[in-house]
């Protein structure tokens, strides 16, 4: 039987409203030992902010940590998956959109995130990325 996104995704993603600060997004990432937070616009999924976004669009540009996440999140159309999407289809979507993470939505609500780390742990358990992704955080 073909695997689905639900079989591999990280469940219960952290969320933040777009007006909240980048510093709060970073705190959520640190608290949850993760590299992303789903961005909401009045409760509706509107984007995903990553540790890389914070490094490149906030720290490197010497912006204030109180900057709203809306100002650092990518403005590209958000690629998403559903829990029942075949895993191979989600991987193809990630390749075609050049994204490392896909928010997983069910009836418009964020239920997970599919990341390269999740895929590495599932598809190539001996890889360095799988080892790193499976390790406990050192924060």
Language model feature labels by segment:
Residues 128:
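Extracytoplasmic/periplasmic copper-protein system
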């Amino acid at each position: 039987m073909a695997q689905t996104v639900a079989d591999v995704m990280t469940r219960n993603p952290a969320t933040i409203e777009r007006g909240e600060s980048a510093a709060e997004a970073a705190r959520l990432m640190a608290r949850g030992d993760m590299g992303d937070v789903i961005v909401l616009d009045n409760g509706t999924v509107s984007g995903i902010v990553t540790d890389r976004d914070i490094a490149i669009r906030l720290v490197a540009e010497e912006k204030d940590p109180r900057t709203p996440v809306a100002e650092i999140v990518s403005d590209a159309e958000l690629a998403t998956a559903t829990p029942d999407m075949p895993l191979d289809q989600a991987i193809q979507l990630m390749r075609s959109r050049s994204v490392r993470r896909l928010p997983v939505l069910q009836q418009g609500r964020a239920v997970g995130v599919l990341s390269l780390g999740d895929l590495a742990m599932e598809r190539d358990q001996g890889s360095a990325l799988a080892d790193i992704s499976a390790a406990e955080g050192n924060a």
